[in-house]
A protein has these predicted regions:
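Membrane-interfacial and juxtamembrane segments of integral membrane proteins
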Residues: 1-137
């Protein structure tokens, strides 16, 4: 993996912005759906909130190798030691928590290392790669 070209900050920021739009669409869809019903149980509202704000990133990252924003931009999140697999769900949750807590600060290390790892990638030993590069490894 040493000869690869890794996604830089700009590509990763575009993925975050894309995911923000996707989450907004999810929220609007859920609100529209709930508006069709007279009495929506609080548990349904809580479950929708948890999925949208807490589980979207870790679930998609652990199951599909990235969020919808990652897919649209052709990047994937993989374990640094095995780019053919997806990171485990508990690691994806921890990665997301660090990313959410640090916000944009987490990306300051992307340009400073040869594999383009953000702080949240370093914490869980993940790496962000271009999709076509995972197919050739």
């Amino acid at each position: 993996m040493e000869n690869q070209n890794y996604p830089g900050v700009f590509v990763r920021v575009k993925a975050v912005i894309t995911d923000s739009v996707i989450l907004l669409i999810f929220m609007l869809g859920i609100v529209a759906l709930f508006d069709r019903f007279e009495n929506v149980p609080d548990i349904a509202r809580i479950a929708a909130f948890v999925f949208i704000f807490l589980l979207y990133d870790p679930l998609f990252t652990s199951i599909f190798g990235g969020t919808i924003g990652h897919f649209l931009l052709g990047i994937r999140v993989k374990p640094a030691n095995n780019p053919h697999k997806n990171i485990l769900f508990p690691l994806a949750v921890f990665r997301y928590i660090i990313k959410a807590l640090l916000g944009w600060l987490s990306l300051i290390t992307v340009g400073g290392n040869k594999t383009g790892k953000a702080i949240h990638d370093m914490a869980v030993q993940s790496i962000v790669v271009f999709k076509n590069q995972t197919e050739t490894l």
